[in-house]
Amino acid sequence: LEKYPKLRFPGFDEPYMECRIGDIYSERSQRGADDMELLSVTLNDGVMPRSEIEGKDNSSEDKSNYKVVCKGDMVYNSMRMWQGANGVSDYDGIVSPAYTVLMPNKEIDNRYFASLFKTPNLINEFRKYSQGLTSDTWNLKYPQIRSIRLYIPSLQEQHKISVFISTLEERIGIQRQLVDSLKKYKRGLLSHLFSEKSTQRCTTKRYYFSEIAQ
């Protein structure tokens, strides 16, 4: 939220532009139809088809009040925006009335703003602008979020930052897969080492704890 951030990529030195979220996004208020794909927003994975999160559709049969989502829209959980529950949709579909759907007013890098909206400074702003007595009832609708001020870089710098973050996320994903593979290997190894057949073949020697601890 600084006009002159301390950490920037080489070649970018222009001051960030001050604006309101309402200058960047408008609310999409179009209502959907029952045959459109039902979407949901998760904290870690952003916008996902509900069928990939829950095997069974437990939503209301009457979806006439559900909101339309188009590819490229920013969608957030109105009651969990202060936790960073938002994402850019790669799908056309509908979401429950508990969500707010934002569509860009101008050309922006939407992925940049999805990451920006998860930063501690913005999370704190979302918390301050949310309405409700306790965290269980906090609610952040478009009339409140559009008033929040922030500083944003040029489109070129937005894209540079967005690509950098995406690259980091890809590398993190690869490392997680590696860790999962190592854990699986460890479980298999331990299962083999301590199986009944393995222990029967092993010769054992008794040690006292004081000997091991030396």
Which sequence ranges carry the predicted segments?
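Short beta-strand/turn micro-motifs at beta-sheet edges
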Residues: 87, 133-138, 195-196
